[in-house]
Structures are given as structure tokens and as C-alpha cells.
Regions:
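Non-catalytic C-terminal accessory region of glycerolipid acyltransferases
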Residues: 2, 11, 15, 146-281
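Active-site pocket-lining segments that scaffold enzyme catalytic pockets across diverse folds
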Residues: 94
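Short, flexible loop segments at the rims of nucleotide/cofactor-binding pockets, characterized by
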Residues: 52, 65-71, 136-142, 174-175
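Short gly/ser/thr-rich secondary-structure transition/capping motifs
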Residues: 70-76, 142-144, 226-228
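Membrane-anchoring hydrophobic helices of lipid-metabolizing enzymes
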Residues: 1-91, 101-103, 110-112, 130
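Glycine-rich, phosphate-binding/catalytic loops in enzymes
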Residues: 106-109, 178-180
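Conserved nucleotide-cofactor-binding alpha/beta core module
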Residues: 109, 113-155
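Short, basic, glycine/proline-bearing loop/turn elements
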Residues: 91, 129-138, 165-173
Length: 281
């Protein structure tokens, strides 16, 4: 079968189809030039080529192939802090919104055969990640199943990779930083007796991305329209080198009643950002 982006029946990521399935009336009202613009900014053809060219690969093999195709290299510091055995939350800042997740999975899949990554439900459409990704925002009748699956995974021997901020970093007052780290990973670490391994990624998106996010916030627009540009930001990173640092294990018993779970989450966030100092230069 022809897997070229031009073959409509072979499309894996299809802006028009998503619009029609999510909001048919809106899809009819949106002019074709807007549809074509959306296709360009999400790099629909590039993404479909990456997926179709590696259609037979899954999980770790697929990730390695994507990184190779995009000529992404990365250096790891503090690799000795990655435990040999046990059950952990590996948590990190989220500066890039795409490639950092791929690098996170690629590195940890070299150490563990059972990694799991809770992600936005939309990413579940990429079947090449089906053995790693877990949906976190299912709605309606599927929500209970998703919650049950998450709890079963937290209770299992799988290693959990997690971006506690949820969204990628934003630029405020001239500084690029994660948004608030959600407290759920602290609560689940305590509940399931999972130690936490903090990590830190180097990297940044374009000024355009940060300025758009700030403008959207200033105008009071709730929809994260800047997220549409994350695929473009990812392809801008081609041939780049990324640094990843792992810190020392934080025992789950650390999270006592001296702080609230939300305060402990911000404490771990601070430990993550302290790791930047371990990157040479």
C-alpha cells in the first residue's frame, strides 16, 4: 500500500478528520486555507512520514528510529543515579514538549523493559507507542477504565515516567520554567511506596512559542493555542544535542506531613532544576 502523505487513505494524522470527528459543524465552517495552514504548522506530512516509514516498529525501537531520522543526539549525566532495581517515578521538567519525552523514553528503555508514560489522550492515536503510553484524560464511559489502568500500573513493577507540569515550559519575566508541578505524583508515590528519581532536561522552544503563549494568556484566551505549534517546535530541533541529568533517588518516606503534597511537588521541582548545574559548560 502507498504510504506517502499524499495518499489520503493512508493518513495516520489527519487534521480534517479530527475536526470532522470532534466538531462536524465547525469543520464545515473552517475555510480550506485554514485547514491547510493547520496541516503545515503541525507538520502533518512529516509526522505521517515518520510513522509510516517505521510502521512495523513499536515502543523503544520506534523511538530510536525517530531520533535517528531527526538526527537528535543527547548526553546523559548522572547515569549512575538510575537504580538497578525497585519501583520508581522518574520525573522531570518539560522544556520542549516532544523531544524531551522521546529522549526520556529512549534512555530509560535501555535500563528497564517495563516503562510506562502517562500522556494526553490525543497521543494514544500513535499506535507505535501502545506498549508505553497510558491515557490520563479519558472522558465519559472510558474514564473509569483509564483510572483503573493507571492505578494498576502504579501498583505494578513498571517504571513510571512523568512530566508533573503537564504542559511544557513557558517563559515568564525572561525566565523559561515549568508551570506548577501537580501534586498527584507525590500522593501516588506515597500510596504505592515508589521512590522518586528527579531528572532535568536542557533545551528551549522558540521566542515565537513563548510570546504566543504570553499573548494568549494576556488576552484571557483559555485554549492553549500555542500547543498547535509544538510539532513545528519539535522539527526545529533537528540535528540538535540535548542534555539529560539524573539526580539521586528520593525515598518516598521523605514526603512526610511537614509539607503538603503540593509543597513537596514544588520541592522536587526545585531538586530537578538544581541538576542543571551538573551540565558542563
Amino acid at each position: 500500500m502507498d504510504k506517502s502523505p499524499e495518499n489520503k487513505s493512508a493518513l495516520l494524522i489527519d487534521v480534517e478528520h479530527v475536526l470532522r470527528s470532534k466538531n462536524p459543524s465547525l469543520a464545515k465552517a473552517v475555510p480550506s486555507f485554514i485547514i491547510n495552514y493547520l496541516k503545515r504548522i503541525i507538520h502533518q506530512d512529516d509526522v505521517n512520514s515518520l510513522i509510516s516509514d517505521n510502521a512495523d516498529l513499536r515502543d523503544a525501537e520506534f523511538i530510536a528510529a525517530v531520533l535517528k531520522t531527526m538526527k537528535i543526539s543527547y548526553k546523559v549525566y548522572g547515569r549512575e543515579n538510575i537504580p538497578v532495581e525497585g519501583r520508581y517515578f522518574f520525573v522531570s521538567n518539560h522544556p520542549l514538549g516532544g523531544l524531551d519525552g522521546l529522549v526520556f523514553m529512549d534512555e530509560l528503555s535501555k535500563h528497564f523493559s517495563n516503562i510506562k508514560f502517562p500522556v494526553n489522550d490525543l497521543l494514544m492515536n500513535i499506535k507505535n507507542f501502545s506498549g508505553i503510553f497510558l491515557p490520563v484524560n479519558k472522558h465519559g464511559g472510558q474514564m473509569k477504565d483509564a483510572v483503573r489502568l493507571l492505578e494498576e500500573t502504579y501498583a505494578s513493577d513498571s517504571q513510571i515516567l512523568y512530566f508533573p507540569a503537564g504542559l511544557c515550559s513557558r517563559k515568564k519575566h525572561g525566565t523559561i520554567n515549568d508551570l506548577v508541578w501537580h501534586k498527584s505524583f507525590i500522593s501516588k508515590a506515597i500510596q504505592h511506596k515508589r521512590d522518586i528519581v528527579p531528572a532535568y532536561f536542557s533545551g528551549r522552544n522558540s521566542n515565537f512559542f513563548y510570546n504566543l503563549a504570553n499573548l494568549r494568556t494576556f488576552l484571557g484566551i483559555k485554549a492553549n493555542i500555542e500547543m498547535l505549534f509544538l510539532p513545528h517546535e519539535m522539527f526545529r530541533q533537528k540535528e540538535k544535542n540535548i542534555s539529560l541529568v539524573f539526580g539521586k533517588v528520593i525515598p518516598w518516606q521523605t514526603f512526610d506531613h511537614s509539607k503538603s503534597p503540593a509543597e513537596w511537588a514544588e520541592w522536587v521541582k526545585a531538586r530537578s532544576y538544581e541538576l542543571e548545574s551538573l551540565i558542563p559548560g
